[in-house]
Amino acid sequence: MRPLFFAAISCGLLSSWLVSQQPIAAVLLGLWLFRVWCLRERHTLMVTLVCVVGFAGWFSWQNHRFEHLAALPSQSMQAELTVQPDAISIRGGQYQLVANGSVGRVLVRGQLKSAHDKQWLQRVTRRMVWHAQGTLAPIDPPTNPGQFDAPMYYRSQGIAQQLTLTQVFQIQAAPRTGWLGIVDRLHQWRWAFAQRCQQLPPMLARYASSLLVGLRPADFQTTMGAIQQLGLLHLFSLSGMHVILLISFLKWGLIRLHLSRQATDYWLLGLLPAYLIFGGGADSLQRAVITAALPIVWELVTHRTSGALSGWSLALMIGLIHNPLVLSQLGGQLSYGLALLLILMPSMPSWKLAVWIQVISLPVLLVATAQWHALSLAVNLIVAPLFSWLLFPVTMIGAIFGTQVPGIASSCEWLLVNFQTWLDWVSHWPGLLVLGQPNAIWAWGLSLLSLWLLRTPTRRYRRLLVLAYGCFILSMRFPLHGAVQFIDVGQGDSILIRQPFNRQVSLIDTGGRLHFPKPHWQDDGLTPKARVETITVNYLHRLGITHLDTVYLSHKDVDHIGDLGELLRLMPVKRVVVPAGMAHLDKFQKLLQPAKQPPIVMEALAGQTFADGLMAVHPFRPGRAENEDSLVLTGVFGQRRFMFTGDLDRAGERAITARYPQLRVDVLKLGHHGSKTASDPEALQQLGVRQGILSVGRHNRYGHPNQETLTTLANLRIETYSTALQGMITYRFFNHRQGQWQTFLKEGNRYQRTASVKNDSQR
C-alpha cells in the first residue's frame, strides 16, 4: 500500500502549509511531490494527487469557516445547548462546558451563583439540554509569544466561539434515542468513573483519571511537574501503548471465555470505538484505535494481513479530516511521528531505539517546551518498561477494586507515591537545559537532519547534527539584535530589555494581580498560576534566557511587583533595584523569600547609572515607594531614548523636566496605565515625546486609559501603542542602528474591533 503512504505524507505537509501557516512546508511538499513523480508509478502519482486536491479543498474550507467565525462581532443571544456530563468542569465559582447547539460546537462559560448551584452541577449524571442567554464571541487570542493559544487549541476540537452565559432559564434531561443512547451511556460511564476516582487516595486518583479516561485533574501540572520536566508526558496521554495494553487485556479475557478468534475480533471492533469515547477521544488515542482496528477489519474482509504502514497512513488521513491541526500539536506530532518511526526502523536493542526516539523527538519537544532534561533518556529507559508491566496494571487494579477493598487502594497509593517521589527527586538533579524554541526553519531542519542520520548513520552526519544544534543554541543565546519589549500582563507593567548578544537582560516590573476575598464555597484550594510564570518566564525560556541580570521595581503596588516572588522562585536574578526607601518595607522583604539564590538589593536615586545603559531620573529623595516615589528610568536603545515612569504622577513628571531641562524622550511608557493623574501635557511637550506606550488591562475596573489622557496624546500628535489592543509591543534594534516596531497582534485584530465598536457606541 505504498500509494497510501506517499499520499498521507503529502496531506500532512499540506496541513502544515495551509492550516498551520508554515511556508517552509510548501517547499517540502513540492520536493515530496517531485519525489513521487520520479518514481514513475502512475497509480501512486494519481492517488497522491487526488488526495492532495481533495484535502486542499477541505483545509481551505475549514480555514474560511473559522476565519469567518473569528471575525464576527460579539452578539447577545438565546441558545439551546446539549451538554454531556463529562464535558462539565468546575473551578472555584466558575464553570466551563463544551456544548452542541444551534450555533454549532461552542465553548460555554458562566458564573455559579451559590453553593447549591455548584453542588447540583457536580451531580449531573446524564446528557442535559440547557436553555440560556449569553454573549457569543470569538475565543480570545493570545497576546504574547509562547502564550497558550486558546483559539488554535479549541479549533482542534471544532470550536471557534465562546458563549458567556448571563442567565440560565432551564436545564432538563435530554431524550435518549437511537445510537445517541449508546454514546450517552459511554459519556455517563466516563463521568461516573471520574467521580469514583475522586473517592480514591490522591495519587491513585490522579493516575487513574489521566491514564484510563484521559481526564487530568486541575492540580495535575502542579503536583506532577516532574513528569513533564523529564519528558514522560507521553506516557500519561492515552495513545498506542495504552491501546496495546487494553487489547492484550481484552484478548486474554475473551480467550478465557472460549471465544473463537473471529468472534474475538468482532468484539474488539465493537469495544475499541467504545473505548475511544470512554477515553476522551484525544487525537493520539484516535490514531491508536484506528491503527489497531484497520488490520482487524482488513483481515476479516480479505482474510489477509495488512501492513502496519498502510494502517498508519489511513489513520493519519482520517485524523487530518477530523482535526486538520493534528500535526501542529505536540500530542499529534509525537503520536504519529513516533508510531511511524517504530514502523520504519530496523530491529535494534531497546536502549538504542530509545536513543533514536530521543534524537528524533528533540526538535518537536523544543518547539513545545524550549527545554530538555539530560536525564530524560535514562529515565525513559527505566520508566517505560516499568510503566507497562507495573504502573499501568497497578493503576487499573486500584481503580477497579480500590473503592471496595481499601487495602488494595492503600497499597497502590503507596507504590505510586513512592514512584512519584523518586521522579521528583530525579527532576531536581542538575541537567535541565533551557535551549530555546526553534523557529519553523530550525525545527524542520533539525528534524530532517535527524531523520537523514537515522537513514545514513555515519560519523559525518552525526557531526553535522551536533554542529547544527550548536549553531541553533548559539543563535538563541547570543542574538545579533536587542529589543525593548512591553509585555502584556493585563492591568500592570512588565518591560523586558535585551542588549544585542544578550550582554545584559533586564526586567522593569513583574506585573501582578490583586486577589479579592471570595466565599468559602468558591475556594477549591488551587491557586491560579501567576502571569510571570505563564507569560514572562515562559517567553524568556523560549528565547533561551536562563537568568536576569537586573530586575527594576518602580514602586510597591501589586500590579508592578506582585509576581516578584514567583519570578525569583523560577529564575535566578543577580540584582533587584528599587526606589530609595523601599528596600526595608515588609511587603518587599516577603517577596524576596521564595528566591533560591537571594539577589543583591540596591536602592536608587536620580542620577545613578547602571550597566545595561539605564539611568535613574527619579526619585530625588527616599520615600515610601508610593506612586509619587516611582523609580523612573531612561536609556537609549537603537537610536531612540526611552523613559519608563512607573505610576509617577503629573507633579513628578514636571519635577523631572525641571531637574533635567535638556532631556528629550522619543518613547515614553505612559504613567499609571493612562490615568489622568499622569501624562501632564506640559511635561510631554517639553520632553518632545514622539511615541507613547500604554501598559493596560482589557476591560479593567479603573477605566484606564482615561479619555483626558487620550485627548492629550491626540493633541500632541503622539503615536500611541497599547498592550490591551496590540498585545506585546516590541522595538527591535541592531547595536546602534535605528530599530523597528512590531506588535504581536496585527492591525484590525479582535480587541481593536471591539474597542472601535465601544467607542462608536459612546459617541
Which role fits each region the language model picked out?
Residues 120-121, 126, 130-135, 146, ...:
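Non-globular, low-confidence helical/coil segments that flank catalytic cores
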Residues 158-291, 296, 550-552, 641-644, ...:
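Aromatic-rich juxtamembrane segments at the membrane interface
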Residues 81, 331, 361, 576, ...:
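Residue-level signal for inorganic ion chemistry
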Residues 30, 41-42, 163, 223-379, ...:
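Hydrophobic alpha-helical transmembrane segments in multi-pass membrane proteins
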Residues 55-234, 534-538, 547, 581-583, ...:
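Membrane-interface helix/helix-cap signal primarily in integral membrane proteins
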Residues 342-435, 691:
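Alpha-helical transmembrane segments of multi-pass integral membrane proteins
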Residues 1-70, 181, 287, 441, ...:
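N-terminal leader/targeting segments
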